[in-house]
Amino acid sequence: MKMSCTIEKALADAKALVERLREHDNAAEALIEQTTALNKRVEAMKQYQEEIQELNEVARHRPRSTLVMGIQQENRQIRELQQENKELRTSLEEHQSALELIMSKYREQMFRLLMASKKDDPSIIMKLKEQHSKELQVHVDQITEMAAVMRKAIEIDDKHGCKEQERIIQLEQENKGLREILQITRESFLNLKKEDASESTSLSGLVTSSDLSLRKS
């Protein structure tokens, strides 16, 4: 009777661990969905990188405010991606730690079950081992796949973020050069206006002098 109670308790504990694994699997699926969304955003950023080349071509024809706004928006998008990347990395580490803890407790429960059932029907033990081993293997495979996807997304995001930062620096330098050219153009225009005004004043003086001479004659 005591042996039967021990087995039932061990089975109940094993079932509870399986339920926790299922809950953990749901959380892992949610994390995979977040990773997929992040990959889509990375693809969108790649497309933006292609579009920014077109922006460089027409930058000279756009107002300064438009260029500054584009740079600010790009910085904000990169910061958001980096923050989301950090949160996903933290979630991945937490899920891996939780999986290791659950696996450890599961092995402990299975060991107790085996020790308590040495004199019982070995077919029960084999059936339990096969059932729970299959379920655990499915969860482990899913977590492993999710971790691989996450690492790839993180590598792509980090690499893309560096390239985008270089693009921003290049755009800022081009913007600075455009402003310098604009300033030089304005100064040249003002100098031309001053010279025109000076020439007009001189011409007006000559006309006035000639007119006075004619009147005296």
Curated annotation (Swiss-Prot):
It is found in: Cytoplasm. GO terms for biological process: response to wounding. GO terms for cellular component: cytoplasm. Residues 199-217 have a biased composition (Polar residues). The keyword Cytoplasm applies. Residues 194-217 are annotated as: Disordered. It comes from the Eukaryota. Residues 6-106, 163-188 form a coiled coil. Its main location: cytoplasm. InterPro entries: SIKE. Keywords: Coiled coil, Cytoplasm. Belongs to the SIKE family. PANTHER family: FGFR1 ONCOGENE PARTNER 2, SIKE FAMILY MEMBER. This is FGFR1 oncogene partner 2 homolog. The gene is FGFR1OP2.
